[in-house]
Structures are given as C-alpha cells and as structure tokens.
C-alpha cells in the first residue's frame, strides 16, 4: 500500500516534505500548481522547470512526485472564445509533465460547478 497526499504549490517546501515523509507519505500531488494564473507560469519551459524542481525536492525527502491536479479551464469547458489558446496551454502542461517525469494528472470537469440538493 502507498500513501499519497497533496500540497498547495505555496506550501511546497523542505519542512512540509520532511513532515510528510515522517508520517509515512510515499507519493506527492501538487494542487494546484502555479500555472495559467496571471502571475503564474505560462510557457512549457517554465512549467517543466518548476515540475523538475519539485520532483528533485520531493526525491531528496524520499517522496515520489507522481501527480498534479488541475481544474479544467472555463474557457475550454464553456467553449469561450479563448478556448483554443487555453487548449494549447493545457497541452503545454501535459508536455511539461512529460519533460519533468510527472506521470499523472488529476483534473475536474465541472463546467457549471457543484450541485447540492
């Protein structure tokens, strides 16, 4: 059995990774990574460098960096005019993951949010 937990990109640091390892976490998810936001990373190279850095840091603590989690951009799910640019950015995320050796992506497809009854 393997234990996986997630860290917000703002909390990716040696202290948290050492804690995760100490409590028996094996695999790490970063949710959300700093991609796509106005002040975030946008190019494939920027994203790959970030992911490689997290992977190296995780491995130095005996963790495997196995996953990032993202929400589907509204521009894609709602077929907005900026859709094609967001699809290309999404593809660059996947390419950057491949460049960095991050094997899986978790995502939510919720074009109109959550419903509760």
What role is predicted for each listed range?
Residues 1-117:
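N-terminal pre-domain/capping segments
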């Amino acid at each position: 059995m393997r234990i996986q937990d997630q860290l917000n990109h703002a909390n990716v640091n040696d202290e948290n990774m050492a804690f995760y390892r100490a409590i028996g976490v094996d695999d790490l998810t970063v949710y959300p990574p700093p991609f796509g936001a106005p002040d975030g990373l946008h190019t494939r190279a920027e994203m790959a460098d970030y992911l490689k850095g997290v992977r190296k840091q995780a491995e130095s603590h005996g963790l495997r960096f196995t996953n990032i989690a993202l929400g589907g951009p509204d521009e894609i799910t709602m077929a907005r005019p900026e859709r094609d640019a967001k699809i290309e950015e999404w593809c660059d995320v996947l390419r950057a993951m491949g460049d960095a050796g991050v094997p899986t992506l978790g995502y939510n497809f919720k074009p109109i949010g959550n419903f509760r009854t």
